[in-house]
């Protein structure tokens, strides 16, 4: 396995503690079949989450998993074991991702660049940056896509669903990125030096008045959320200028996202929890 895949939550916890102390082509990359049976024990290292229709999609070190509405049992989606390091739902049935190929695909480069699925995760094809980019942080809103390339630390921005890119220097090492649902050029990043905001898609940055660090989620309602490495949830009603605690997930997070008004958090024990009340209370949404 890629060692960097498993240390990210630990690095996040370490960063939170440190801050507290301070005050292209169309190549087919995978063609899974329809969803298969119950989880086979291979669900590990959740890197990303998304909701399409009424189904929760779970992007992991061993491929894509799903949990339909009303079912907490996560099931493998198809046969691909590609390592999906970055994952985001562009719109219903259309996903973007990044990471590393299925070990059986020896003809693929180690970094898949940006890949997309237009059939709800059943098949994937290369969009751009094949062999060059490995997005460990990947977010989208409409046709706007932002990624943090782990190969060089750059923040990359696309306004055409990943066909072309602009490259920007981050203000510091980035853990997480969130897009303002009301303005696609306004983005926030959580870094090893705190939270920074950009009004122009990553070209320029200014620090916010906080030393918090963690995973960001920005629901459509306008309230911004930050999930710390200790599982504590913070909420901001003013775009990240001020924060207040709202609750806790009861574990160490590995992924965090918003869908509608709901929040979803993946934990290091490979469960996924959901909150419908702004992070105050959490219920189990999916488990191996």
What are these regions (language model features)?
Residues 63-78, 110-128, 156-169, 196-207, ...:
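Asp-box/BNR beta-propeller loop motif
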Residues 104-111, 148-151, 189-190, 228-229:
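Short, solvent-exposed loop/turn segments at conserved positions within beta-propeller repeat blades
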Residues 80-85, 130-135, 170-176, 210-215, ...:
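Short coil/turn segments at the loop-to-beta-strand junctions that recur within blades
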Residues 38-65, 82-87:
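Beta-strand-rich domains and repeat architectures in extracellular enzymes and scaffolds
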Residues 58, 97-98, 147, 189, ...:
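Residue position within the beta-strands of beta-propeller blades
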Residues 47-50, 88, 139, 178-180, ...:
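Conserved beta-strand position repeated across blades of beta-propeller domains
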Residues 53-54, 92-93, 142-143, 184-185, ...:
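Short coil/turn segments that connect the beta-strands within blades of beta-propeller domains
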């Amino acid at each position: 396995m890629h060692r960097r895949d498993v240390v990210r939550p630990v690095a996040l916890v370490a960063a939170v503690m440190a801050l507290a102390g301070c005050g292209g082509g169309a190549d087919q990359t995978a063609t899974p079949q329809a969803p298969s049976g119950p989880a086979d024990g291979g669900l590990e290292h959740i890197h990303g989450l998304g909701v399409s229709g009424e189904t929760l999609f779970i992007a992991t070190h061993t491929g894509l998993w799903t949990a339909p509405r009303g079912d907490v049992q996560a099931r493998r989606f198809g046969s691909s074991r590609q390592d999906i390091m970055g994952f985001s739902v562009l719109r219903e049935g259309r996903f973007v991702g990044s990471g590393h190929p299925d070990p059986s695909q020896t003809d693929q480069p180690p970094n898949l660049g940006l890949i997309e699925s237009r059939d709800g995760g059943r098949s994937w094809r290369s969009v751009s940056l094949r062999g060059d980019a490995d997005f460990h942080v990947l977010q989208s809103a409409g046709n706007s896509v932002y990624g943090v390339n782990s190969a060089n630390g750059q923040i990359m921005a696309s306004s055409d669903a990943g066909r072309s890119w602009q490259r920007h220097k981050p203000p510091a090492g980035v853990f997480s990125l969130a897009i303002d649902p009301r303005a696609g050029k306004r983005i926030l990043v959580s870094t090893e030096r705190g939270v920074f905001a950009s009004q122009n898609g990553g070209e320029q940055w200014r620090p916010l008045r906080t030393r918090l660090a963690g995973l960001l989620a920005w629901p459509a309602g306008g309230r911004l959320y930050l999930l710390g490495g200790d599982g504590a949830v913070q909420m901001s009603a003013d775009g990240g200028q001020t924060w207040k605690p709202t609750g806790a997930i009861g574990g160490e997070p590995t992924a965090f996202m918003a869908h509608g008004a709901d929040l979803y958090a993946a934990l290091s024990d490979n469960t996924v929890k959901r909150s419908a009340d702004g992070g105050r209370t959490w219920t189990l949404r999916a488990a191996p």
